[in-house]
């Protein structure tokens, strides 16, 4: 029976795993130290080479002579001390004070008395410090990463193609949106212009029709505009022949008014005037009724006529238009005749009768529906369907707790049920 190499069980054996690990770690440490030493030696060599180049440049005169690296720490009153003089036995404090008194007249960066001399840049060291600070700045690192990513995207043709496609799609969407907005504006403008043209044509048509009717109606007698008085056509023609001012028109109207008052004392003439007035009003009513039946929108036509009349006052001072405007003012309401009142009353009565018949029909229909429902309920109670209704009532009134308590006997019946999953039925 061989137990293998027993030396491997010894702690000092070089082939054990622990000893191999120790040797490897020592070698790694030695290698790291060697690398550090080599790096330091390389830096020293570079620094010496720079110093030699700097010294050679100073000797040649290409560069100004530079002070030692640590001399800036001793600048000021203490930096001007000459150690050789101190060795010769001169008191240093007195010398320092003398130097300070001499330099009080003109401050400079050499004495350290110049404001801001502490924060002044000190050559290459300050530049190196600044560069290291910039490199270690987190914002600078973030910007550097962003620039690298941008450079990667720009160098990647696939991504650039996708970006171009996206930009093109966005531009096309914007152009389509602009075109749609332009089309909508154009349609709105067209609709407005067509509606305004239509309304103006309707106004002109209605104004021409009213003027024709005014010219055809009452050839013998006519009303003076504004006073509701009737004069002969000869007087009216005289008024139309010469353009009258507003005061002359008022005077003419007042004369006609007084003439009509004086003539109203004679009864036969007054009766004839009344009959002609009633006949003219009947003709006008019949014409207005026919116009209502023909036109589908009387309110709009009336409003357009009123607007036309208002604008007509400024456009042309013709007496025909003034008569039309005074007769049909916005607050004008004409009196209905007895025949029209009777006809409207009959229409209202017929409408009320029809409404009453409709109400009775609805009531009868509801009564029939209720009778049919009662009949169906009776049939259900005979056929044994009342149990279904009772079940529905009990289900609506019972709760989940009642149902669980009713079925509690079936939840666990034997000891075997304890071993089964309670979720499975």
UniProtKB/Swiss-Prot annotation:
Coiled-coil regions listed in the entry:
20-70, 333-377
Q: Which UniProt keywords apply?
A: Coiled coil, Isopeptide bond, mRNA processing, mRNA splicing, Nucleus, Phosphoprotein, Spliceosome, Ubl conjugation
Q: Does the keyword Nucleus apply?
A: yes
| Per UniProt, location of the Glycyl lysine isopeptide (Lys-Gly) (interchain with G-Cter in SUMO2) cross-link in this chain | 391
Q: Where in the cell is it found?
A: Nucleus
Task: Give the Phosphoserine positions (modified residues).
Answer: 170, 218, 222
Q: Where is this region: Disordered?
A: 146-343
Q: Which GO terms describe its biological process?
A: mRNA splicing, via spliceosome
- Compositionally skewed regions (Basic residues) per UniProt: 175-193, 251-274, 284-306
Among Pfam families, the record links this protein to: Cir_N, CWC25
Gene Ontology cellular component list: nuclear speck; nucleoplasm; nucleus; U2-type catalytic step 1 spliceosome; U2-type spliceosomal complex
Described function? Involved in pre-mRNA splicing as component of the spliceosome.
Query: What family, per the record?
Result: Belongs to the CWC25 family.
UniProt subunit comment: Identified in the spliceosome C complex.
Report the protein name in the record: Pre-mRNA-splicing factor CWC25 homolog
Its source organism is Homo sapiens (Human)
């Amino acid at each position: 029976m061989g137990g293998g190499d027993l030396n491997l069980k010894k702690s000092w054996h070089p082939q054990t795993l622990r000893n191999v690990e120790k040797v490897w770690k020592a070698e790694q440490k030695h290698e790291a130290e060697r690398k550090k030493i080599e790096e330091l030696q390389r830096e020293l060599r570079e620094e010496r080479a720079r110093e030699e180049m700097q010294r050679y440049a100073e000797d040649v005169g290409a560069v100004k002579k530079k002070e030692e690296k640590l001399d800036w720490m001793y600048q000021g009153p203490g930096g001007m001390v000459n150690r050789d003089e101190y060795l010769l036995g001169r008191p240093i404090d007195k010398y320092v004070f003398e130097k300070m008194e001499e330099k009080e007249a003109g401050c400079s960066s050499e004495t350290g008395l110049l404001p801001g001399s502490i924060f002044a840049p000190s050559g290459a060291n300050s530049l190196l410090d600044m560069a290291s600070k910039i490199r270690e700045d987190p914002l600078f690192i973030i910007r550097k990463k962003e620039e690298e990513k941008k450079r990667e995207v720009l160098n990647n043709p696939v991504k650039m193609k996708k970006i171009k496609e996206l930009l093109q799609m966005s531009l096309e969407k914007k152009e389509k949106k602009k075109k749609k907005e332009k089309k909508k504006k154009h349609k709105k403008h067209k609709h407005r212009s067509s509606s305004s043209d239509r309304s103006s044509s309707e106004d002109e048509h209605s104004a021409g029709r009213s003027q024709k009717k005014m010219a055809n109606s009452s050839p013998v007698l006519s009303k003076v505009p504004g006073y509701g008085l009737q004069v002969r056509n000869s007087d009216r023609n005289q008024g139309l022949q010469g353009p009258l001012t507003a005061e002359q028109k008022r005077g003419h109207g007042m004369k006609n008014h007084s003439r009509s008052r004086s003539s109203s004392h004679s009864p036969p003439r007054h009766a004839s005037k009344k009959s002609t007035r009633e006949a003219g009003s009947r003709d006008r009513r019949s014409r207005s009724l026919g116009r209502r039946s023909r036109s589908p929108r009387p309110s709009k036509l009336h409003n357009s006529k009123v607007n036309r009349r208002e604008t007509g006052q400024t456009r042309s001072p013709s007496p025909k238009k003034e008569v039309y405007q005074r007769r049909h003012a916005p607050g004008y309401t004409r009196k209905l005749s007895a025949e029209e009142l009777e006809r409207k009353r009959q229409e209202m009565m017929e409408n009320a009768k029809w409404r009453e018949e409709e109400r009775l029909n609805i009531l009868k229909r509801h009564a029939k529906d209720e009778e049919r429902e009662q009949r169906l309920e009776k049939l259900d109670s005979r056929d044994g369907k009342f149990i279904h209704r009772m079940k529905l009532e009990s289900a609506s009134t019972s709760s989940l707790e009642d149902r669980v308590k009713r079925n509690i006997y079936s939840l666990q019946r034997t000891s075997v049920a304890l071993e089964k999953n309670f979720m499975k039925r």
